[in-house]
């Protein structure tokens, strides 16, 4: 009998029932997940957006004048993001380049990669304790102590992400550049890094999202102050970021309207950060294909 004459095997009734059950379960799980996400986003926005005013965004809190403002918290968040990225990007990218392009001891490289994976899974409150002992006890509670703590937290992520991006560059590109007489560093600078810049940039943007949403690592290191300072003065003094301020207003002061307003702002910022990462990746992919 030829292939055309063969009939497709009929599924048994129990088999069809099983497949329908699995398919229905997957659809139900997807629907519940989507509904829960929409409920959380909608609830936070409904509770938070009406409380977002220009006065809230542009003033400092004052107990004497019975005024609430989050301008210092916004500035502190910007300061700590900039300070963290200024340290963690050179360390993470440079370390990844060394491990991928220069290191010859594979056991050492494997040990470092394993340590980076392990550090990525440590709860952030432990980093807060480490940061307090290493930085706050020596330089005092300050945004700089919090930024250095966040550097330790985000370094493994940027290191491993950059490593994986470097490995996507074909070895033939390196060999071709070497064949043209280029040196090691010139090959890395002109061939390897441009070939994986999309992954590196995306990893850095996503790290901004993690820094933005971090609170536990800053509780014992950055402090709770709400004072407007310049960049360098701000790094040397204690200050609350938006996430820490959210905790303070909700837990300590019972200002749930302000807490939901901050939550809505953070949610929008997180969405914009993830959207930026997606757009950057898509742009580099189009450039590479075109």
Predicted regions and their residues:
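Generic hydrophobic transmembrane alpha-helix motif, especially the helices
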Residues: 117-153
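Transmembrane-helix boundary motif in ABC transporter permease subunits
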Residues: 84-116, 277-286
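Periplasmic/extracellular loop-to-transmembrane helix junction in inner-membrane transport proteins
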Residues: 5-25, 42-84, 105, 248-257
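C-terminal transmembrane helix and the adjacent membrane-cytosol boundary/short C-terminal tail
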Residues: 21, 99, 163, 167, ...
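Hydrophobic alpha-helical transmembrane segments of multipass integral membrane proteins
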Residues: 75, 79-87, 91, 95, ...
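Interhelical loop and adjacent transmembrane-helix boundary motif
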Residues: 61-68, 218-268
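Membrane-cytosol interface at the C-terminal ends of specific transmembrane alpha-helices
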Residues: 93-106, 110-113, 139-192, 202-207
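Transmembrane alpha-helical segments of polytopic membrane transport and secretion proteins
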Residues: 1-30, 277-290
């Amino acid at each position: 009998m030829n292939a055309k004459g063969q009939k497709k095997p009929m599924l048994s009734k129990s088999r069809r029932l099983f497949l329908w059950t699995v398919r229905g379960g997957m659809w139900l799980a997807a629907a519940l997940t989507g509904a829960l996400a929409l409920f959380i986003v909608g609830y936070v926005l409904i509770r938070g957006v009406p409380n977002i005013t220009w006065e809230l965004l542009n003033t400092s809190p004052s107990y004497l004048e019975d005024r609430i403002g989050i301008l210092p918290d916004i500035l502190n968040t910007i300061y700590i993001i900039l300070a963290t990225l200024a340290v963690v990007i050179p360390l993470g990218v440079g370390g990844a380049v060394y491990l991928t392009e220069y290191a010859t001891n594979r056991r050492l490289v494997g040990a470092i990669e394993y340590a980076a994976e392990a550090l990525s899974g440590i709860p952030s409150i432990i980093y807060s304790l480490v940061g307090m002992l290493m930085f706050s006890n020596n330089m005092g509670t300050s945004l700089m102590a919090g930024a250095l703590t966040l550097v330790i937290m985000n370094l493994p992520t940027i290191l491993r992400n950059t490593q994986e991006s470097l490995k996507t560059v074909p070895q033939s590109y390196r060999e071709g550049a070497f064949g043209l007489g280029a040196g090691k560093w010139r090959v890395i600078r002109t061939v390897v890094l441009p070939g994986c810049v999309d992954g590196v940039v995306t990893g850095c943007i996503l790290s901004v999202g993690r820094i933005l949403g971090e609170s536990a690592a800053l509780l014992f290191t950055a402090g709770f102050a709400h004072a407007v300072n310049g960049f360098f003065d701000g790094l040397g003094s204690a200050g609350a970021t938006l996430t820490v301020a959210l905790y303070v207003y909700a837990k300590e002061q019972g200002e749930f309207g302000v807490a939901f307003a901050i939550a809505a702002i953070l949610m929008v910022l997180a969405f914009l950060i993830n959207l930026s990462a997606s757009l950057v990746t898509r742009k580099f992919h189009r450039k590479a294909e075109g």
